[in-house]
């Protein structure tokens, strides 16, 4: 640290590293911790009777500038992307690097089905720019989905208890072991500064009628060093009096509520789209599933369920909603999950344009890639 930066640190108590203190020397949250936003220090200097007096005011950054908006898609290897969006002839190992030329973040979907090995995660890091962000879905068993033993890491399969249908029972010991293995893989992203949030996408069967949010506290505690976003897939968590209890729970635990854009229907699996909740002012999350109610309810595959191409008018609505969230959050992640054909990457590109962000031009001769 040079003399100028050292003097700045001593004067303000603020550094650009991973550990911060406020003006009184108290520890502030580390980068990436699920906590309240770090305040910036506004230093006002004025002259009085030939003497300089310094007034140091802790000013919430939200009052002076909006948060950063990152736009991406839920996966980079969806079959529709390969067929319609990527350049023809591009190799599987080249797709992520090409994706990263167009977007600053991606939501990893494959981790829902299996824990990636260290070599795979290391390749993700090497194939993306330094500032790229990975939001990562937690394993489906941690998300309270019905899970066959074969989808567990090999070292856990033979020890897992199963029911009569061969589905794994989520015991405290298994939850801890699976979480530790998952976090070891994520430590590579974390060490590279590329880990965004861990996404807990709860099963629709996890309902307030049968379950209590306190059941998640053990997992939340194990993930305390990461930013955790929770997507409810049962709308009963987000309506009536239950909504306030849900939001209060997330705020107490500094977990991030996942806001949704979905069809205007009241089926229990469709979350309401009129919520813009920010439960951790470090980050707001918005996932877009499309607005095709019939496809959403009847689709037998992901491509069929999320078969929706956002119109320009709807993209403009999403842009305004993203800006509203950015007014009260340090960062906003907007993820298109309408993964049919190339709908998601095209919608994400159009949203970046609507937000005034840089849009990479598609290659003129994709056959050459």
Question: PLM features: what roles do these ranges have?
Answer:
Residues 54-369:
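Residues lining hydrophobic/aromatic ligand-binding pockets adjacent to catalytic sites
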Residues 35-36, 62:
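Intrinsically disordered, low-complexity regions enriched in polar/acidic and amide residues
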Residues 1-3, 18-21, 59, 336-339:
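Intrinsic-disorder/low-complexity regions
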Residues 3-7, 12-22, 28-31, 37-50:
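Short, low-complexity, charge-dense intrinsically disordered segments
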């Amino acid at each position: 640290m040079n003399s100028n930066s050292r003097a700045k640190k001593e004067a303000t108590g603020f550094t650009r590293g991973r550990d911060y203190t406020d003006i009184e020397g108290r520890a502030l949250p580390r980068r990436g911790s699920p906590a309240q936003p770090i305040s910036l220090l506004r230093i006002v200097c004025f002259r009085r009777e030939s003497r300089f007096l310094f007034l140091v005011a802790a000013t919430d950054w939200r009052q002076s500038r909006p948060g950063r908006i990152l736009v991406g898609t839920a996966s980079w290897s969806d079959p529709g992307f390969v067929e319609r969006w990527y350049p023809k002839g591009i190799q599987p190992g080249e797709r992520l690097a090409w994706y990263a030329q167009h977007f600053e973040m991606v939501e990893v979907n494959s981790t829902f089905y299996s824990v990636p090995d260290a070599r795979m995660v290391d390749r993700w890091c090497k194939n993306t720019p330094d500032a790229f962000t990975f939001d990562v879905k937690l394993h489906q068993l941690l998300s309270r989905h019905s899970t066959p033993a074969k989808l567990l890491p090999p070292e856990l399969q033979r020890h897992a208890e199963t029911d009569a249908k061969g589905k794994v029972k989520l015991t405290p010991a298994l939850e801890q072991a699976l979480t530790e293995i998952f976090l070891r893989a994520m430590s590579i992203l974390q060490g590279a500064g590329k880990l965004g949030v861990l996404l807990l996408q709860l099963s629709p069967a996890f309902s307030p009628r049968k379950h209590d949010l306190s059941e998640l506290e053990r997992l939340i505690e194990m993930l305390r060093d990461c930013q955790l976003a929770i997507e409810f897939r049962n709308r009963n968590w987000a309506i009536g009096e239950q909504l306030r209890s849900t939001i209060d729970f997330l705020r107490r635990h500094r977990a991030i509520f996942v806001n949704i854009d979905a069809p205007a229907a009241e089926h229990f699996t469709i979350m309401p789209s009129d919520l813009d909740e920010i439960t951790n002012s470090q980050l707001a999350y918005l996932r877009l599933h499309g607005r095709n109610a019939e496809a959403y309810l009847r689709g037998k595959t992901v491509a069929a369920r999320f078969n929706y191409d956002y119109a320009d008018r709807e993209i403009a609505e999403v842009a305004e909603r993203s800006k509203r969230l950015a007014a009260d959050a340090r960062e906003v992640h907007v993820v298109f999950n309408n993964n049919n054909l190339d709908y998601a990457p095209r919608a994400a590109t159009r949203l970046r344009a609507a937000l005034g962000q840089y849009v990479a031009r598609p290659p003129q001769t994709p056959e050459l890639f």
